[in-house]
């Protein structure tokens, strides 16, 4: 990983650097405006943090991302095996119980929150389909990565063009 910001708010992955049309990063707890137990750069609105602080952190994150219009898509993860395809109609709906997101639409930032779980990022370099997966032990046992690849397969991804991180 390498620092993408001097204040350590964002760390990047070298593996996906070869694909300039996507951004692949992790945020840290540094530099946010949340207070108390959430004194961090918390962008997850499902954990009990103040909505105003979460929204300010999300705006800060948007300002750090390349591109003029970035829509953050942040699901309410429940350690499930549920995969959701994000399109223009669904992006504004609540994403309850979703632990993996898939889209081929530019301008969406698919987000997953992790602590001791593993973020898995998939990208088809030909079809430009991307997935972000929250793989905790329950999701892993339920084969969430395999199920996400199956959903991507419905969008005609090519396994030879699929990259994973």
Region spans (language model):
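Active-site microenvironment for binding and transforming phosphate-containing groups
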Residues: 1-165
């Amino acid at each position: 990983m390498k620092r993408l910001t001097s204040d350590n708010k964002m760390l990047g992955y070298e593996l996906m650097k070869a694909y300039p049309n996507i951004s692949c990063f992790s945020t840290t707890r540094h530099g946010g405006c949340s207070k108390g137990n959430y004194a961090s750069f918390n962008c997850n609105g499902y954990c009990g943090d103040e909505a105003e602080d979460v929204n300010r952190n999300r705006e800060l994150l948007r300002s750090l991302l390349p591109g003029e219009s970035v829509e953050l898509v942040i699901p309410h993860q429940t350690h499930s095996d549920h995969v959701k395809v994000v399109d223009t109609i669904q992006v504004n709906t609540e994403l309850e119980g979703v632990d993996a997101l898939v889209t081929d639409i530019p301008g969406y930032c698919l987000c997953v929150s992790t602590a001791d779980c593993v973020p898995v990022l998939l990208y088809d370099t030909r079809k430009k389909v991307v997935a972000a997966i929250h793989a905790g032990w329950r999701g892993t046992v339920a084969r969430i990565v395999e199920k996400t690849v199956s959903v991507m397969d419905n969008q005609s991804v090519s396994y030879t063009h699929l990259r994973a991180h």
